[in-house]
Amino acid sequence: MTDSHATGDMPRVTIYTDGACRGNPGPGGWGAVLRYGQHEKTLKGGEAVTTNNRMELMAAIQALRTLTRACDVALWTDSEYLRKGITEWIHGWVKRGWKTAAKQPVKNAELWRELLAETQRHRIEWHWVKGHSGHEGNELADTLANAATDEIQAAKRQAMAGEQ
């Protein structure tokens, strides 16, 4: 997944991510849109019992994991938790052995570790966009996240119907 419009020798990729959850915890999904040149790739997935923050993290992890080589990435999210977590808070968490400033264990630490590992391969600019504000890339990621959530809920209903 690369783009001929590169910064230096790194391909330039734009990523939009979003997470969704019905109930918190509850069934949830994540969606990602990756754009490079004239190409677009969409990704989605979900879990039967999760949280909105876990789905926001999964969207970014899976999108970055999809890139086959080091890239110059502009990643857009409507989650301040994700953006601030990876750009501001994570450095302190690592220094404190994955504890918060209040000495509590960091929530979703295993996902933050995965995200941190994925970021090491790329040069990433993290951007925040207001959710549900008509931003086309974010809206598409939101649609994918909700579609994944719908699929999780449908599979659960089907499994429950089969048990009767």
UniProtKB/Swiss-Prot annotation:
GO terms for biological process: DNA replication, removal of RNA primer. Binds 1 Mg(2+) ion per subunit. May bind a second metal ion at a regulatory site, or after substrate binding. Coiled coil: none annotated. Mg(2+) 1 binds at residues 18, 56, 78. Keywords: Cytoplasm, Endonuclease, Hydrolase, Magnesium, Metal-binding, Nuclease. GO terms for molecular function: magnesium ion binding; nucleic acid binding; RNA-DNA hybrid ribonuclease activity. Its EC number is 3.1.26.4. CDD domains: RNase_HI_prokaryote_like. Belongs to the RNase H family. Endonuclease that specifically degrades the RNA of RNA-DNA hybrids. This is Ribonuclease H. It comes from Chromohalobacter salexigens (strain ATCC BAA-138 / DSM 3043 / CIP 106854 / NCIMB 13768 / 1H11). The lineage of its organism: Bacteria, Pseudomonadati, Pseudomonadota, Gammaproteobacteria, Oceanospirillales. The gene is rnhA.
